[in-house]
């Protein structure tokens, strides 16, 4: 079943169009990655889906409903949850306090203690440091905390923006193993990532965005062709190649 359908999405800052006629889908329980170089429009697309930025035109259906008409808090309550680029934690709050901020809406508050237990089971280091200030944690631990905070909102669709940003290679591997475990719980994930190898290791399909347009779409195996992917990153693949080949 298709959970998210994006059709002809166009986004602009004033007169400057930064994302143009993007089309994507995410199925229930699927991990889909959105790849591309800096400035391609990946985070801008995620901001529109999360509700922090308005689209100029296009349609986004989430579980059959018009996502673009929903307010930000309504999207979170419906299960559309953003784990933002750069983590965006509150450094002077404890681990536990940061996690509780993820369960601010009524539906999540009802199951707050159970979700906290689930997060601590998934990230034992957070349980060990639940009263420690978030600002005193390592980069990898902070990324786990950001993921945990997103999970506290009880997501159905997790918008995961650049989870490997600023992390050492060993920690990148650890974070993506955790993403794999999260996806095993049937949470759908739209993953924005510059580290294509890591992203394709957890995704079933992917899209490549270059200069605001989808220039390539394929299975993870198909996108693992390094030369083809590099050409797509730099916008050298024709738009008519951008057709999704399902396994």
Residue ranges of model-derived segments:
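Glycine-rich phosphate-binding loops of nucleotide-dependent enzymes
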Residues: 1-247
